[in-house]
């Protein structure tokens, strides 16, 4: 059995330790104090209640993925999130909304996990054809730059479902 963890690095929950909108974790989150060690992870338009969030869901504040503090915490520190779990035996990560992560972030993450375990898997959630994906006006390099080992193949999933339901006679499978 291989254990692949779900890496959600695009956003956090509004009631996570890092944001703590409901003060569940003692009021040290970015929503509670500008002195929070996590404050710079987020973009506040008007602190604390007006902030950038994933697809405008205020329960999912978006993270500044390339902020040096976030990069250290998630990837590069000796006991970063990915290093911690890889050293405990995780076999890789599935990246939630990979197309909303900068290529540079994915490349750093890949280097780190492969440095710990060269056989680790880095799988991306990409809903469209990942080989031709353009996100935020930029052609993605999931495969051409060797960023991801694989992607979740939703176009194939859709083709199978359409065929089973008799919608297209299997045209999408050719």
Regions found by a protein language model. Give the residues of each.
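Active-site-proximal helices and loops of the catalytic beta/alpha 8
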Residues: 10-11, 16-26, 81-83, 91-174
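A structural motif corresponding to the C-terminal end of an alpha-helix
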Residues: 1-3, 84-91
């Amino acid at each position: 059995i291989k254990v692949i963890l779900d890496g959600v690095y695009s956003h956090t929950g509004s009631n996570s330790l890092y944001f703590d909108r409901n003060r569940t974790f003692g009021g040290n989150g970015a929503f509670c104090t500008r002195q929070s060690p996590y404050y710079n992870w987020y973009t506040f338009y008007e602190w604390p209640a007006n902030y950038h969030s994933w697809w405008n869901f205020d329960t999912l504040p978006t993270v500044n993925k390339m902020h040096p503090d976030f990069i250290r915490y998630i990837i590069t520190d000796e006991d970063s999130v990915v290093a911690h779990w890889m050293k405990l035996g995780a076999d890789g990560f599935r990246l939630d909304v990979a197309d909303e992560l900068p290529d540079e972030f994915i490349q750093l993450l890949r280097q780190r996990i492969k440095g710990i375990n060269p056989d680790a898997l880095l799988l991306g959630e990409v809903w469209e054809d990942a080989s031709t994906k353009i996100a935020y006006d930029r052609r993605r390099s999931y495969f051409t730059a060797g960023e991801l080992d694989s992607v979740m193949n939703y176009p194939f999933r859709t083709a199978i479902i359409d065929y089973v339901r008799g919608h297209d006679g299997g045209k999408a499978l050719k």
